[in-house]
From Swiss-Prot:
Subcellular location: Cell membrane
UniProt-listed InterPro entries: PPE_dom, PPE_sf
GO BP terms in the entry: response to host immune response
Name assigned to this protein: Uncharacterized PPE family protein PPE36
Entry-linked Gene3D superfamilies: PPE superfamily
Length: 243
């Protein structure tokens, strides 16, 4: 943890007032909520497609299809839950920022204290302003204490929010067998043909904003979508290959 107690209120107050604010964090939270909703929709659509397919075709291949697809459906469910939880934690971090900013001493008040103290010291030739100078210094010490305490609490709240975010797993491997893979591909085409483009545009790229949390989307040369949270990959989605 940074030593906020070593920093005067001029620095602590100015930093939090001039920062990017909670906007980038809230944008990331909205993106994760949208992603959670889309994953849930994908799961429901996939399950519906499976039900429709199984109503018209039953046999060994259909049973194999169920066995191969259920882990993917479960992964969609779990990942949607984790994405929603991440949105909650990001919102908590944004709220912590707003509370900290409201509790910080305004920079203008700190500057006014320093200017008034300097002026009083400059004209205190006979000690007539000594009491007022002491009062100003006491006020300044209180500002120092208040800012340092607020920043320390804010740091702890943000760290707790980040550490509470979920770990995202890669989607399960799909069947390598040609017939089963073809059937799975048919189901995916039923609902997920444009899934990759949807996911890419769901989560905003807030890496361009400065803030304690970064969230970007990346697509590698193999077509795998990766969501990077604080520099670490947290979720990936890869389209099922076409046959």
């Amino acid at each position: 943890m940074p030593n906020f107690w070593a920093l005067p209120p001029e620095i602590n107050s100015t930093r939090i007032y001039l920062g990017p604010g909670s906007g980038p964090i809230l944008a990331a939270a909205q993106g994760w909520n949208a992603l959670a909703s889309e994953l849930e929709k994908t799961k429901v659509g996939l399950q519906s497609a499976l039900d429709t397919l199984l109503e018209s075709y039953r046999g060994q291949s259909s049973q194999a299809l169920i066995q191969q697809t259920l882990p993917y459906v479960q992964w969609l469910t779990t990942t949607a839950e984790h994405a929603h939880k991440t949105a909650i934690q990001l919102t908590a971090a944004a709220n912590a920022y707003e509370q900290a900013r409201a509790a910080m001493v305004p920079p203008a008040m700190v500057r006014a204290n320093r200017v008034q103290t300097t002026v009083l010291k400059a004209i205190n030739w006979f000690g007539q302003f000594s009491t007022r100078i002491a009062d100003k210094e006491a006020d300044y010490e209180q500002m120092w204490f208040q800012d340092a305490l607020v920043m320390e609490n804010y740091w702890e709240a943000v760290q707790e929010a980040i550490q509470s975010t979920s770990h995202f797993e890669d989607p399960p491997e799909m069947a390598d067998d040609y017939d089963e893979a073809w059937m799975l591909n048919t189901v995916f085409d039923y609902h997920n043909e444009n899934a990759k483009e949807e996911v890419i545009h769901l989560v905003p790229d807030v890496n361009k904003e400065r803030g304690p949390i970064e969230l970007v989307t990346k697509v590698d040369k193999e077509g795998t979508i990766r969501l990077v949270y604080d520099g670490e990959p947290t979720f990936s989605y890869k389209e099922h290959p076409k046959f």
